[in-house]
Amino acid sequence: MGKILAICTSPRRGTLKTPVPSAVLTPEWGIVGDAHGGSWHRQVSLLSAEKIEAFRQKLWVDYGAFGENLVVEGFDLATLPVPSFFAIGDAVLEMTQIGKECHSDCAIRRQTGDCIMPREGVFARVVKGGTIHTGDEMKLLPTPADLPLRAAVITLSDKGSHGEREDKSGPLIVEMLTATGYKVEEALLLPDDAAQLKTQLLRLADARQVNLILTTGGTGFAPRDITPEVTLSVAERNAPGIAEAMRYHSLTITPRGMLSRAASVLRAKTLIVNLPGSPKAVKENLEYILPSLAHGIRLAAGLDGECARK
């Protein structure tokens, strides 16, 4: 059981959040009247009161100074899994992300060399609306057993990211995942850039904690095909059987299947799989591996405990 010590809002971006006695939460926006609301996964930001109190040993800060909407006592929020669900009165929040990078002009970091929001702040979307008040209790709800597996899709394409070519593979993956029951949290289109890809893989696996990341493109022999190397650089455990199975299946269709350098790995509880770049090859490979992925993903997440066939 936790307690709301402060509710903070700001009417415009770039201005400090200040405490208010109450607020209205809506699924469409987040906190009514707060500039950082919208139709996205970071409608409401939360920070543990205990973390603010510890930071005050270095520098006194008011509630809202870190850009947080809700100051919550009684929970170490950043240690909870994504998604976690909270009830505040009639309102229900779904925690969707842990941490985010400070903006480039973070005054607190300039003063102290540190800011706790990137590692201690969490973000949520409003599942059910309601009015909340300072002093309200916040309850951690049981995670629903029927939640869909959560996925993200990344297309790697220099031409696609510059608007010179339509991305057909990414939307196809989203369509196939959705049809299979996955919830696709994000679909990104990036250039073949190692730094950008690594940043997004780390964010999706560590902060958003999606169950599955599928990349498309950048798995061949061209000089800018860097997807497998970046994928392996973020891996904590190898899962080579998936990439090997795709190569085996591709070889039954074309001898060029041997030219794929695709990797498949695990980072914490997130499975990352590299798919080819062409829509035809994406469809062929994903149709082949998709029926078996869910069991492996659930094992990695600790949701299934039995792997042997009966």
Give the role of each language-model region.
Residues 15-18, 36-39, 115-118, 144-147, ...:
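Solvent-exposed alpha-helices and their adjacent loops that cap or buttress functional pockets
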Residues 73-108, 237-263:
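Mid-chain, well-packed structural core segment of small domains
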Residues 146-192:
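Glycine-rich phosphate/diphosphate-binding loop of Rossmann-like nucleotide-binding domains
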Residues 227-310:
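Proline/glycine-rich low-complexity loops and linkers
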Residues 121-144:
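Well-ordered alpha/beta subsegment
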